[in-house]
Structures are given as C-alpha cells and as structure tokens.
C-alpha cells in the first residue's frame, strides 16, 4: 500500500466563499437601523405565534425574541383587529425600551389593511408581501401596486416572499405550458424552481417600476425540501442582486427541523448566499419561541460567520465518564452565559468570542481546556477526584469538593471582568 508523503506547502484551509454582492437594505425604527445585505453581517430574524390582536401578549413575545437576539421580528397582520393592534404593540415595546423593528406579514388582504389602517403601516418597519396570494387576475396587479405605493409613501422596505405552497397559479400554469412545448421538457421540480424564481424577480421588477428602490427590496423563495431550497437560491442568487432572506419553510419539530434547516442554510451560507435568516421551527407544546433564534445564531456562530455568545465546548461522554457532573456543569455554564449576554454584550465588548471548555475525563480534557480561554477537565471514572482549571492555556488551580460548579462559574465571571471590561456585570 502506497503511503502519501506530506506536502511542502500547508494544507488548504476551507472557509466560506466571499459574500455575494447584494444591494443593502436598511430596516429602521427610531435610532435603530438593521442593515440587510451589502457587506452587513447575516441578520437573524424570527416570528411571533401570538394572536396579534392581543397587543400585550404579542409585545411580550416580541420582547422575549429580541432579548434572545432576534434583530427583526415578524408579526402576522391578517385582520382589522390585528392591524389596529400594531400601533399599540409598537408603543408597548417602546415603553419597555425594545427598539427591534417589526415586520408585518400580509396575505390576501394586505392592500386593504395597509390602506385602512395608516397607523399600522407607519408602525411597521418592513412589509412582507406574498405575490402568490396578493390577488387574482387583474386584481393582483392593482392590489400589489397599492401595497408598494404605501411602502413608498412611508419609506418602508419590502420582502417579496414567494412560497411553493402558495405560488401564483396563473404564472405556474404559463410556465407549465411553456415547458410542455420544449423538445425535452423539464421535470416537475425544475418547473417549480423556475416558477418560484420568476415570481420573485418579476414582482421585484414590478415594484421598482412602481417607484420602490431596489435597495428597499428583499427576496425569498421558500420550499420545504433541502435540495430544492439549495437549487432555488443558487439560481436566484445568479439572476439578481437583491438581498436574500433564507429559510426552509415548514421545517418541522425538534431535531428534524433543526437538522433540515441547518443542512440547507449551511450550504448556501458557505457559498456566500444569504443576507438574513429565519429558522421556521414548529415548537413543542409550551416550549419557548426563542428556540428558533438560538438555532439561527448557533448556525452562524459554528460556521464562523458571527459571534453571539461565548461558545461552550463539551465532550459527548463515554464509558470513561459515568458521572453526570460534567454534563450538568456544561449545561449550567451554557445557560448562564446566554442569560448574561444581554448585559455582557453592552459592558464587555468581545465577550461573545470567548470559548469555554467543559470536559469529562483525562483523555482530551486537559488538551481541549488548554486551547479554550477557560477550561475545566472533570475527573472520569476511576480518576482522581480533582478538576484542573486552565486559563489561556495555563493551569491556574484545581477544584475539588461539592462546589466545583459555583467555583468554576466564579472563575468565568472573573475572566470576563478582567479581560473584556472593568465593571462588575449586573445579574440578569
């Protein structure tokens, strides 16, 4: 068997491709400006699942999503009661000091709601329009134009969001007819991809003709199959320069939804495609809505595209780690770091880049701990009941006894205070 010899040059290191050149949009509320596209970092957004007519309940959930790190929050605006509640939601948020921009999600009757409730139109920072259900036949163009004209009047960006489950049926029928005339017809998936892209780009071009600047337009073409989403966005990115919103629609619940969204979005983000993302998870009954924000952040952070919170490195456990102490410590530290971030990110710039290692035995524990900013190697089965702690690669102490968790957390706090700022962090 032939064994290859080492190369004279260093191995090639893989990183994301340069970001696609897209137009930069600005979503504003008060002094808060969220940049989407251009050279801005990929933005994280989310969506409420409250009844929007419940202004207090919706404002509370928006606050929770924003506190988790959502930079834009979308709310459903589907009824007169919902439209009437939007200004009250915005007012409640402003009173609470939450300046996250709100995006209004419109289907079927958006033209009428925006026209009849101008205070709603002004309180929103961005509109989402679905060209597949904005109207049928001649009404479609008229009602689409009404929404774009209101966006122009109030200087609001628009996301033209096409979804495979609500495609413009007239457009789809035309593309299917054209396909039937081909010498070698495309398969059904290719036709669907073409219909999605055509709907998005033609709608964007129409919006520009109506006076909406191209820098105020964001596009999305959502499907529920991973490979189809990748194909759609690769082609959409090739054909236009609008900012792109990425998301796998109806991703599902639990680990399936997380895996599917991660599989699709990671490929596109690695190729430099995507300016803002949303993870469409179906929450477990009673589960916090903020989970979709955390997953979006973790995708971007693990890919090295953005940093949101200190990263906890922990081993998976094996027969050497029959104790659950390291698992409990890793979970507690991860939770603690995330809880502190709303305060720490203001007081200690750069803390989001910190790495913390919580390891379960002597095999990889000391090595991983030395490579982290702070690391602890807990004893495995049969090992000495001692946990060495490393700070910036240097062993600083060994913890023993029943208060290892509290003592290690205190070391983390001290590191943050001394390396990222001079003030003592407030508790959240």
Swiss-Prot record:
Q: Which top EC class is given? A: oxidoreductase
What catalytic activity does the UniProt entry give for this protein?
(2E)-4-hydroxy-3-methylbut-2-enyl diphosphate + oxidized [flavodoxin] + H2O + 2 H(+) = 2-C-methyl-D-erythritol 2,4-cyclic diphosphate + reduced [flavodoxin]
Requisite cofactors: [4Fe-4S] cluster
Per the entry, the cofactor note is: Binds 1 [4Fe-4S] cluster.
User: Can you name one GO molecular function term for this protein?
Assistant: 4-hydroxy-3-methylbut-2-en-1-yl diphosphate synthase activity (ferredoxin)
Question: EC annotation?
Answer: 1.17.7.3
Instruction: Kindly list any coiled-coil regions of this protein.
Output: none
Extract the NCBIfam families matched here.
Answer: ispG_gcpE, PRK00366.1
Report the function annotation for this chain.
Answer: Converts 2C-methyl-D-erythritol 2,4-cyclodiphosphate (ME-2,4cPP) into 1-hydroxy-2-methyl-2-(E)-butenyl 4-diphosphate.
From the Swiss-Prot or TrEMBL record, give the protein name: 4-hydroxy-3-methylbut-2-en-1-yl diphosphate synthase (flavodoxin)
Source species? Ralstonia pickettii (strain 12J)
